[in-house]
């Protein structure tokens, strides 16, 4: 590796504080939020603020949170949820989605909903407690065999075995050994991501530039990994 021999300075040559432009999709992705707590609500807010993506459905067992979230982000303050826009559990949505796909394949309407326009989901945001991530992710993947992108809030799970379980489920999704058509292959090629947002925080991006890209600080000799949990997490919710 060629060392940087220029005069040391820690002045950034890039600007990381500028907000990204509003993202406009030619075909806006349709999003399901699982969990209408503070994290799920935060995602919904920034989805609406930063892009033209559409929040089309919510899974939340608490009736008040479900209604509050839906009226703000989906069916409007004076509206009521249409069939497919509100669920009390992710399992109910999986059942609905399985029925929707079958009706699409056969050309028949949804069970008991003749003529109803189905709510279609392209991506799912998993915003439940850490220890529930595995159950939700594997339940969706095994129940549907793929077909939707999934974003999981950090951490991925609470144990290595749990993470491996999700990996194995995702790896095997749709791999039935048969030949796939172009459309079928495209349907299976979805994204699975973990929302490690601090990788993109301005201070971390600046540090990465100074240490790795420009080598202005010096070599990394050791790393102390900490999780600075803010005090507000202690006042209203669980703490890892």
Model-derived regions, located:
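N-terminal Rossmann-like dinucleotide-binding module
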Residues: 2-81, 114
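Acidic-histidine catalytic/liganding microenvironments
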Residues: 50, 73, 173, 201, ...
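Conserved acidic residues
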Residues: 56, 84, 122, 221
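Receiver (REC) domain switch-region micro-motif
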Residues: 58, 124, 150, 223
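A structured beta-alpha segment of the ubiquitous adenosine-cofactor-binding alpha/beta core
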Residues: 83-120
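Beta-strand-loop-alpha-helix segment that lines the small-molecule cofactor/substrate pocket
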Residues: 119-123, 129-199
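Glycine-rich, N-terminal phosphate-binding loop of Rossmann-like dinucleotide-binding domains
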Residues: 127-128, 227
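Predominantly a Rossmann-like dinucleotide-binding segment in NAD(P)-dependent oxidoreductases
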Residues: 190, 198-240
């Amino acid at each position: 590796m060629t060392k940087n021999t220029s005069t040391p300075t820690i002045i950034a040559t890039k600007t990381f504080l500028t907000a990204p432009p509003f993202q406009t999709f030619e075909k806006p992705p349709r999003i399901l939020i699982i969990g209408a707590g503070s994290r799920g609500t935060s995602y919904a807010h920034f989805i609406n603020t930063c892009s033209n993506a559409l929040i089309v459905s919510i899974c939340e067992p608490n009736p008040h949170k479900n209604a509050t979230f839906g009226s703000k982000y989906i069916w409007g303050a004076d509206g009521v949820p249409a069939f497919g826009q509100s669920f009390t559990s992710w399992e109910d949505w999986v059942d609905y989605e399985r029925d929707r796909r079958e009706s699409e394949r056969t050309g028949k309407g949804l069970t008991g909903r003749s003529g109803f326009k189905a709510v279609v989901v392209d991506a799912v945001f998993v915003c439940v407690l850490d220890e529930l991530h595995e159950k939700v992710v594997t339940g969706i993947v095994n129940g549907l065999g793929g077909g939707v992108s999934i974003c999981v809030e950090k951490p991925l799970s609470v144990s290595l075995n749990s993470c491996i379980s999700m990996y194995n489920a995702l790896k095997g999704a749709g791999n039935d050994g048969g030949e796939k058509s172009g459309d079928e292959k495209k349907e299976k090629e979805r994204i699975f991501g973990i929302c490690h947002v601090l990788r993109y925080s301005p201070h971390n991006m600046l540090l990465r530039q100074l240490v790795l890209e420009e080598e202005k600080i010096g070599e990394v000799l050791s790393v102390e990994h900490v999780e600075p949990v803010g005090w507000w997490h202690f006042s209203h919710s669980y703490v890892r």
